[in-house]
Amino acid sequence: MSLFSAATTAVERTGYGSRYDHIFDMFHPIDGRIPAVCYKRLLETINVSGEDKDRLATLAGSILEGGDGSGGILTSSFTRESWRAALLLANVAQDGLPFDDPSQLVNVDTLTPMDFSEEGERSSINFSASTTGRSQTPLFGDDLDDHSIQSSRSESIIHNNGHSRGHSALDWNPEEQEALQQSQLSQSQLSRSTTPPPLNPQALVPESESGVWTAPPRPDFAPNKADSVTLAIVPEREGMFLFRHVNYSISSVSGTDRITVIRRYSDFSWLQDYLLKKYCFRQVPLLPPKRLAVNGHYLSSDNYFLERRRRGLTRFINQVLRHPVLGQDEAVRTFVTLRNDISGWKKSVFNTAREEFNGRTIDPKFVQQWDEQQATALWAGLIVELDRSHDSVVQLCVLLDRVAKRQEAQAVDSAKIAYNLGAALPPSARVLYSVADDGCVQQITRGLSRASARIETDCQLQQDEARGSQVGVLEEAKKYREALGSMRELFDRLEKYGGNNIPLLEKRIQQNQGRVTLARQRKALMSEIEKLDRAIKMDTEMIAAHKNRTWLIRECITEEIGLFQKTQLQISKLLQEFCVDKIKYAELYSDNWGGLDNDVMDLPV
């Protein structure tokens, strides 16, 4: 058995694959790979002897694609599988076990979590940017606000205004700088600036590239497509006394089978959090509130509220499934089909979720045709119009709901009118007109009875119209309201998480270049100059990764704006539903009152 196969088997036996994957993702792999130098630098931070470190580097070079088997690790790159194998070798070496014998390595089933040295711990840093509210700066402005670096060990914070506590960003030694460059965190661990700087499109486009960019092929987005999933409230509640919760049965069709699963509100909330973590820059639908509160006091969850929340959850899950990207996610499909308990599954899926841009590179055609001025104007205008339109549609939903409630109240009054009209001259009260018994009493009594029946029919029509409005026109208005809201929140997330640390990295490159010049002038040791050169190289690679991510965000939002354009079809459907309902019930009312007219026109007057 080869060393790679033995190490892979040991990874499966120990169950440390997810730990090693987490470290792999921290280096922001490009096309599913990270430079092999990351492993060599990682070896310098673990507690093993120098001889073992050299041996580990040699073994890693032998299992890498492109490695020459004799320490050729600097010219190679790691895939996720080879990274797991190499990191397991280091883990085994740290435990003092034989790490170069496949026959012994394959039997390893228990390991101590990797222990990093103080230098390695010091290199664990977080990038953060202070952002509050909606920025008033352009979407692609030249400046970044309040860049800061926070050390997880010393709690030192260095701001870009030059004031610092603890270490200075310019006083760190090259080893700490290189470790900092290698500690790129995933998007879920970063709070980036709200205003990414403008990037030069030609910097990423080869001269030979040509053509017109088109969005990646996706399933067709049809905002008015019929719901593929239905929700119903389960009558029996679960949980302990005073902490009982409502369950929902989700019914969907998979092939020829109809699948029904049970979920609670917190499960839907988890699904939204998962989508926001993985698809931060896409239109993630909005959830209805879990409970209603007035002045900080929660209202009781009566049947009326539970029904409204059920409709809101139905809109949420169906809008997720309609989205050409979100709806194809494996976790979303599993959410609506997995019958088993999903507690463990949710934890596993959420912990392993990574931003959708991991391992992707921007299409050069998109960069080439990008018009920054046009995009800035378009996006800024969209933000303003989204706010205005959203507020108007919110008011529309309130008014439609109010009309439906008035119809229900009017139906109750119509029922009372029908009752009292029928009781005005009952058969037992004919004694009122017994003196002049000319036959008119009987005709009028029959007329009252028929009028009462017609008014009862009118009452039923009003109730049907109110219910139809709530599940028809009002639901369509709410779907459009939530489409506007999800797009508006997308731009909010862009401002909060769409920035980068390019200015900070460029400043650090300039500082290190100056140090290299000074070191050459004073004829410093070549090892010091090489460390500075490696730091500059790693910073340059990080800038390229940040630029690539910024372009991917722009491409993603451009695609989402294209999808959003189709939501105008929801307005058409809303108007059609409104018109059809009005014509339908106008004809029914006309037929009902026309029949009453025929019944009463021949009464004696």
Swiss-Prot record:
Domain PX: 226-343
GO molecular function, one term: phosphatidylinositol-3-phosphate binding
InterPro entries named among the record's database cross-references: PX_dom (IPR001683), PX_dom_sf (IPR036871), SNX8/Mvp1 (IPR028662), SNX8/Mvp1_PX (IPR035704), Snx8_BAR_dom (IPR045734)
Residues that bind a 1,2-diacyl-sn-glycero-3-phospho-(1D-myo-inositol-3-phosphate): 264, 266, 290, 309
Membrane topology recorded in Swiss-Prot or TrEMBL: Peripheral membrane protein
A GO cellular component annotation in the UniProt record: cytosol
GO biological process, one term: retrograde transport, endosome to Golgi
Coiled-coil regions listed in the entry: none
Cysteine disulfide links: none
Pfam families, alphabetized: PX, Snx8_BAR_dom
Domain-level remarks: The PX domain binds phosphatidylinositol 3-phosphate which is necessary for peripheral membrane localization.
PANTHER family referenced in this protein's UniProt entry, alphabetically: SORTING NEXIN MVP1
Family: Belongs to the sorting nexin family.
Designated name of the protein: Sorting nexin MVP1
Name of encoding gene: MVP1
